[in-house]
Amino acid sequence: MSQARAVSTAPTGDAADRYKWSALFNTTLGVLLVSINESILIIALPDIFRGIKLDPLVPANSFYLLWILLGFMLVTAVLVVTLGRLGDMYGRVRMYNLGFAVFTVFSILLSVNWMHGTAAGAFIIGMRIGQGIGGSFLFANSSAILTDAFPENQRGMALGINNVAGIAGMFIGLVVGGLLAPLDWRLVFIVSAPFGVLGTVWAYAKLHDSGVRSRARIDWWGNVLFAVGLTLVLVGITYGIQPYGTSAMGWTSPRVLGTLIGGVAMLAAFGVVESKVASPMFRLQLFRIRAFLAGNVASLLAAIGRGGLMFLFVMWLQGIWLPLHGVSFANTPLWAGIYMLPMTGGFLIAGPISGVLSDRYGARPFATAGMVVATLTFIGFLFLPIDFSYAPFAILMAVNGMAMGLFASPNRAAIMNSLPPDQRGAGAGMSGVFQNAAMVLSMGIFFTLMISGIASVLPRTLYRGLVAQHVPAATATAVSHLPPITSLFASLLGYNPMAKLLGPSVLAHLPAHSAHVLSGRQFFPTLLATPFSDGLAIAFTFGAIACALAALASVLRGQKYVHAAEAVPAGDAAGLVVAAGVATDEPVLAGRSVGTPVGVAGVAGGGSRYAPDEPGGPSGGPATT
């Protein structure tokens, strides 16, 4: 059973004003670095694979490509709740500072890889997992640090800036990766080190804990079940999109079925364990707070709908559109990042504004509008031809970025405002799990949908294209069985596999013009365009449905909700206190709580002092002081 201690050591007056800005700048730097490192490898993968001499045409090597990306994100999804709990127990700043140091050390280690082939791929995956552990410390505690540092009427602004940095970093990483990777693939890792050192020293020097603590035990069973369950599901997806026997995909493989069933069973067992242990990883009673539940459901659906979007655009631009417009494969990574900047711009415009306005008007109108607009942009992408004109593509990307900006900052602020002070670390961690797990699953889902769309069309398209260039029918038949995952990753890596698949002996006996066409930059992208378009249609439809459901969840969150512990004492300026989604403009007196069907955990003036697992906690009746 947990107990909370609320002996505040927070600064007051001018010191508090200075401290909150220091906390904002440092946590924003931390979140920015982590998010840049989530995406910087997407665009740098061609140079990394060439640098470590890993052949993308070997289907089994797709495991390394996927897990170089997924390993980092999986760790953040698995650990963020536990590390948020450790922040509640031992100090959010202490855990945050440790995370900055760990993240920096592994960023340096990633740049000293001397191996090649699969050994180098395994080393990068391992070091990325270590880097992700450091990033998990930062993600799990940054929102709670800001919520402690800022008053309720500025919290949306602070969390909005922090959230903007986190999502903008995903797009900045694309451009940075495109700039650095052609120079040396190791630069995409070492670039974070000096900023990490700066952030670590700054955090240890300037940040300090609020003094709010929770005594609790770590839910080891829950952590293990969740980690193993989610990992098994992702491993099952990884092997499911690889060929199996004579099938283009491996969903009938006993290994795939076993890992997927085992993963789902582990996650089901996790839910049972969480309802019974004294100090669960997921504090299920927090889901009785309507604003917390609705905000997290909306966040999960939005992340599932949009998590794989960036990868689709990178493949579309880097593997098809840019080569068709005369850009060499060596330069496609940089230009793919540049051409995606409208999405970043849209998000940077809408994110901070919606955060500030949501402090005044509540999260529901902005978050709901954001998901409705996102749904419409997915529908718009369905009508774009594969070889589109850039102007409408850029407009749709900018509007999609604005939609995410409208949603993200208000939704995050509403989630954090709904939590009692001593539960902010755990609550932020739970919210992070929803978002990060959904992002990881979204990547697997989008890759699966794309490959499903490609698999039905690719063989006959390849065969016809090869025969049209005078390739013998027997050779064309053999090459047409190229696994869909190989073609998809060749597209992602900006790689034309035709010369290697046909071999010098076949090319030497073809007319000179045909040999030139087959090994040129446009033949493979042109052939892949039709199958790729079918895959895009499936993926965009899925994204539109997920975002529409996120809009519905956002509508159901209720009116503005602020936990009663945030209310001002009588005699101060009137505070807006909301319980169970019902707003009131009545100031709350110290020692008095607002009675509602769910109950408000906490009291006016200074934090809650209840045991979260007992009556008077988030799920119980009025708290006592």
Where do the protein language model's features map onto the residues?
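Hydrophobic transmembrane-helix bundles of small-molecule transporters
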Residues: 182-297, 305, 616-625
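Interfacial helix-cap and linker-helix signal at transmembrane-aqueous boundaries
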Residues: 48-49, 86-87, 176-182, 237, ...
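C-terminal module of multi-pass small-molecule transporters
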Residues: 79, 91-100, 107-110, 114-123, ...
